[in-house]
Every structure is written in structure tokens, then in C-alpha cells.
């Protein structure tokens, strides 16, 4: 169900398609225990989940579980299957490893997926059927539709912002909403009171962190 794979870019935790999240978390704990003293606290790994679209809402819980075990997820890789993906993993690792922000100067079309371990900034539109998975925040200088998942590494402090926030789905850490912003009004989505709220830029009120 879970295993580690060493590549030239570092260690990757591969999670095969699954039905029960608790079984996956237990399997991760067991595998790390089995590896004895291989890891040191704070070691960074990459995460790849087979059929990630099916399990996107579980990613924050998996990242949090790994952090509790002393491991930090530096990047999240996309793949439909685990077997035969080594070359794809290497290509994606070279483009994302140790990068704090990813800037995209184009529209993201339907069927395209952008994955990055940090913040994602898009100078263009995110069309219906497109998806962004970001470890940090997502800012779109254009119309944002499709699915945007933020805070997969950063957690609840991440935000999703756009000049026109008309997304099909917004996820920040473990919170999900299908609400949209006011049409043609620059808006920002953030976690407040244990839920995602969407507010105009000029009226946004962030929850104070302790």
C-alpha cells in the first residue's frame, strides 16, 4: 500500500490507490518504524499518491501525519499510477524541488493540473476543468474556475485569491467549499472560524493566529 522509492532527486513516499485513509496512515507509521533509524527528525521527502484526484482531500491529513512522525513533505507529485512513473517523477522533481514559489504566465486549460510544494501565482485564467494543488497559497491574476487546493503543506494560513473567484471547488488544508466570490470582484478565500470564507479584497478580515 505504501513504500519509499529513492531517486536521484531524493526519497519519494508512494501511496497506491486505497479505500481507507486510516489504513494508509497506519501503514505509513508501520513502514517508518520498520525502517528503524533511517530517518532523522526534519528529513524532507516527496509525496506521490496514485489517483490523486480521488484522494485530494486526504493530502493535508497525510502531510500532517508525516510531520507528526518527524518528516516534512517538500513537494507533492502527480501520477495516475505508481508503477512506471520514475521518469515522470524525475522530470517533475527538477522543476519543483526547493522552490518557494511558482509563477505561471499563461492560462491553465481544462484537463491541466498544476502541482507545486509552495505558493502558486498565475498571470492568466484558470479554466473550468483545470486544477491547482499548492503547498502554500494560490493567487490568480485573472478569472479562477476549476478546482483550487491550497495549504497542502502550509495548512490553514494559506489563502486563495483571484481577480474573479468563480471556482468549482476551493480547498484550504482540510476545509472545502463550493462557494464562489462575487462576480468580477477581486476576492480572497481564507479559513476563518473553522470554515472557508470568501471576501472582497477591500473588506477582507483575517483571523488572528495565536
Swiss-Prot record:
Keywords: Cell cycle, Cell division, Septation
Biological-process GO terms, alphabetical: cell morphogenesis; division septum assembly; regulation of cell division; regulation of cell septum assembly
InterPro entries: CAP/MinC_C, MinC, MinC_C_sf, MinC_N, Septum_form_inhib_MinC_C
Pfam families, per database record: MinC_C (PF03775), MinC_N (PF05209)
Gene3D superfamilies from the UniProt entry: 2.160.20.70, Cell-division inhibitor MinC, N-terminal domain (3.30.750.50)
Family that this chain belongs to: Belongs to the MinC family.
NCBIfam families: minC, PRK13992.1
Subunit structure: Interacts with MinD and FtsZ.
HAMAP family cross-referenced by the UniProt entry: MinC (MF_00267)
Protein's job: Cell division inhibitor that blocks the formation of polar Z ring septums. Rapidly oscillates between the poles of the cell to destabilize FtsZ filaments that have formed before they mature into polar Z rings. Prevents FtsZ polymerization.
Protein name as catalogued: Probable septum site-determining protein MinC
Organism this protein belongs to: Thermotoga sp. (strain RQ2)
Taxonomic lineage from the root: Bacteria, Thermotogati, Thermotogota, Thermotogae, Thermotogales
Gene name per UniProt: minC
Amino acid at each position: 500500500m505504501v513504500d519509499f522509492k529513492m531517486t536521484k532527486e531524493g526519497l519519494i513516499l508512494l501511496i497506491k490507490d486505497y479505500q481507507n485513509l486510516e489504513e494508509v496512515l497506519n501503514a505509513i507509521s508501520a513502514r517508518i518504524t520498520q525502517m528503524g533509524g533511517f530517518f532523522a527528525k526534519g528529513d524532507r521527502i516527496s509525496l506521490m499518491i496514485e489517483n490523486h484526484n480521488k484522494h485530494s482531500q486526504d493530502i493535508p491529513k497525510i502531510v500532517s501525519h508525516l510531520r507528526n512522525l518527524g518528516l516534512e513533505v517538500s513537494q507533492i507529485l502527480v501520477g495516475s499510477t505508481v508503477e512506471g512513473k520514475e521518469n515522470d517523477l524525475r522530470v517533475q522533481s527538477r522543476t519543483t524541488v526547493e522552490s518557494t514559489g511558482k509563477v505561471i504566465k499563461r492560462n491553465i486549460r481544462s484537463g491541466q493540473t498544476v502541482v507545486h510544494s509552495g505558493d502558486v501565482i498565475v498571470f492568466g485564467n484558470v479554466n473550468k476543468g483545470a486544477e491547482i494543488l499548492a503547498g502554500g497559497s494560490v493567487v490568480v491574476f485573472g478569472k479562477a474556475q476549476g478546482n483550487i487546493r491550497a495549504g497542502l503543506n502550509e495548512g490553514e494560513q494559506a489563502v486563495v485569491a483571484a481577480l474573479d473567484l468563480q471556482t468549482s471547488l476551493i480547498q484550504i488544508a482540510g476545509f472545502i467549499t463550493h462557494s464562489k466570490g462575487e462576480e468580477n470582484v477581486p476576492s480572497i478565500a481564507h479559513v476563518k472560524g473553522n470554515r472557508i470564507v470568501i471576501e472582497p479584497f477591500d473588506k477582507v478580515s483575517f483571523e488572528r493566529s495565536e
